[in-house]
Structure formats: C-alpha cells, structure tokens
Amino acid sequence: MLSKQSIANLTEADLAGKRVFVRVDFNVPLDNGSITDDTRIRAALPTIKDLLSKGAKVILGSHFGRPKGKVVDSMRLTPVGDRLGELLGQPVVKCDDCIGAEVTAKIASLPNGGVALLENLRFHAGEEGNDAEFAKALAANADLYVNDAFGTAHRAHASTEGVTHFLSPNVAGYLIEKELQFLQGAIEAPKRPLVAIVGGSKVSSKIGVIETLLDKCDKLIIGGGMIFTFYKAQGLNTGKSLVEEDKLDLAKSLMAKAKEKGVEFLLPTDVVVADNFAPDANAQTVGVDAIPDGWMGLDIGPDSVKTFQDALAGCGTVIWNGPMGVFEFDKFAVGTEAIACSLAELTASGTVTIIGGGDSVAAVEKVGVAEKMSHISTGGGASLELLEGKVLPGIAALDDR
C-alpha cells in the first residue's frame, strides 16, 4: 500500500506558528452565487480543525470551475469562504489572489489558529500547467504542505505536485488518508469475497478498472449502458440501445478473461426498455434476448436486481462504480436505487462498502443511504485511476513514511 506521511504524524510542536498550505477541493455546485451542496467543504473540516487546534496558520488553496487561466468573477471563492467561516465558527481571511504582495501581507498578519482562503488557483494558467515559478510563488507563503484534495490527486498541477519541490514536509490530510485506506485496501488486502459492481454508459471509460478488478475480485457485476456492448458481442439484438461497435472484441476478451480467472461475470438477464430517451418514455421489461427493434435499454430489470442481490449476499467487500441505468430519470432509477439499498443493508451486517466516486455517489445520495456506506470516495477520475492501480501524481509527491 502507498505508505505516505500523514497529518496525523505531525505534533503541536511541528505545527504551532507554522504557515501550512493546504490544498483542498472546494469545487462545490453554485446556483446564483449560493452553494447548493457543501459536502466538499465539510469533508475538509477534520484536517483544517486539527491544524487550527495545534496552532498552525492555515492557508487554503482550491480550484473552482474552469476559468482557463483568466479571472472570472462568477468563479471567485467568496461564497465558499463565507460558508467555511460558518462551519468553523471563526472568520476566514479572504484573499483576492493566490500569490503576490497583498496575499503575503494577509498571511503575515494571520494569528496562530487563523485561516486564510486564497482566490481560485485556476485564475493562473500556471496552476494547470504545473509552472515551477507559480508553484514557487505559492510555496513562498508557507512552511509546509498538506494535500487533502483527492479529487485532483490524479493531476500534476502546481498546487498538487509543483509546490512539493519547494516545501517540506509534504503530507496527506485526513481525507486523502481515508481514500487510500479504503480504495487501496480494497484492491490490495480486501475482506473476501470481493465483489465489484461496474456501471455507467460506456465500456471504453471503464476498461482499465474492469481489467484491474478481474485480477482482484471474486465476482464482477456489470450494469448500465455498457451491458449492450457485451450483449452485441454475444450476438444478441440490442435495438436502439447504446453500443460501442469498436469495443465488441474487447467485450469478448473481458468475458473470456473472467472465465479464465474463475471470476463470476454477471450481466443482467432482463432490462427495462424505452421507446425514446426521455423521463416520460413508454417502458416495458423484457429478457435480454427479446429487446425489440427501435427500443433502447435504460435500466436493469427486476430479475437482474434479484440475481445481483443474491450474488452480493455474504460478500466481505463491495466496490461500486457507476449506475445500473439512467437514474436521472425516476422511471429508470429503480435498478440503481435497489442496489444502493442492498449495499446499505450489507454495510449494517458487516460488509465493507465502497462507493467509488462519480455518478454512484449521486445515486446513493439521491436514495438517502450515503451515510450508511463504509466509504464514499470524493474523487471521480482519481478514484478510477487509483482502482486501476495507476500512480496519482498528487499522492506520489507526498513524503514516504
């Protein structure tokens, strides 16, 4: 397992009076300037509060949206600073930039146990370009570095990788530590049987994770739009369902690899089909060998839900990445919601349940069972890349234990 130094290894003596640059992920959804979901801000609180309690001067840096290296007023972090102040119960000093003399002056006047929030890092092109001069300017206002932004750990940016060349120590925050513990633990030393559920619309976006999981898991459940590429590869009629014609050979090879490795490979046996892609489309449930021409599959059927629930019974660990159907449409959310509820029940009986980022997180939140899972990953692409066994630059840059 990637054994990295963590904030937990730092004492009050290490931190009191020190300027700590903390890379956080405050890329929260906004509606007319109001935050609609503050989950990402709350996820960073354990790290921020720990540093404050040890007398550090905390300097927070985050990206927000995609301003592409220019100042975009609607992407300023002011609403985030206001919400963070409410959650911490103390004022947050808001900077109008993330580098420069004004920022340096504001940080210099911070008391021990004070917090400053830098302006959107991506207002500077040097952030995503991992420009050494920009990274050096960020680091100039700090003594040590904490990365707690798992969602951007798969990117080598100035604030995730570049700054580590100018600061020491460089450690993981509690959020990243938890992500590594669960996601890597599930791949490297899982409580067995290990069952992986992979959904979503395209096989192409999940090839790496499926191939890695076939080497690790005992059962692999496939759902979502990608199932139709597997059906077409088996010679079945898929109607108007989404099929990646250039991935048919790959689908065949993945099924063959599962057989060769003794991994139980489960595809749905029935699907809910619709006459068009709309929330109010006409729908019917059919066997996968009876999909009518002109209809498209938008969810797994009730028999498949039952089969998948039986396959999950008694498992030690479940990793779930990607919905079972078009869960944004209530009519086609039944399969995804049933799996979410099953995982909540399994967690209560001792199964380790890991929701691996992206749409599956939105699904468990929609059903209201997010709190009942063992771990919900805060990364989309980062979660997938970690599960694929890839090196994440933002993690690799941290100090080894």
Curated annotation (Swiss-Prot):
Organism domain of life: Bacteria
Binding site for ATP: K206, G297, E328, G357, G358, D359, S360
Broad class of enzyme this protein falls into: transferase
Keyword ATP-binding part of the UniProt annotation: yes
Keyword Kinase: yes
E.C. code: 2.7.2.3
Major location category of this protein: cytoplasm
Keywords annotated in UniProt: ATP-binding, Cytoplasm, Glycolysis, Kinase, Nucleotide-binding, Transferase
Cellular compartments annotated: Cytoplasm
Pfam families for this protein: PGK
Catalysed transformations (reactions): (2R)-3-phosphoglycerate + ATP = (2R)-3-phospho-glyceroyl phosphate + ADP
CC annotations in GO: cytosol
Pathway the protein contributes to: Carbohydrate degradation; glycolysis; pyruvate from D-glyceraldehyde 3-phosphate: step 2/5
Gene Ontology biological process terms in this record: gluconeogenesis; glycolytic process
Xref: SUPFAM superfamilies: Phosphoglycerate kinase
InterPro entries: Phosphoglycerate_kinase, Phosphoglycerate_kinase_CS, Phosphoglycerate_kinase_N, Phosphoglycerate_kinase_sf
GO molecular function: ADP binding; ATP binding; phosphoglycerate kinase activity
Binding site for substrate: D25, F26, N27, R40, H63, F64, G65, R66, R122, R155
Family named by the database record: Belongs to the phosphoglycerate kinase family.
Family matches, as PANTHER family: PHOSPHOGLYCERATE KINASE (PTHR11406), PHOSPHOGLYCERATE KINASE 1, CHLOROPLASTIC-RELATED (PTHR11406:SF23)
Quaternary data: Monomer.
Protein name: Phosphoglycerate kinase
Organism expressing this protein natively: Synechocystis sp. (strain ATCC 27184 / PCC 6803 / Kazusa)
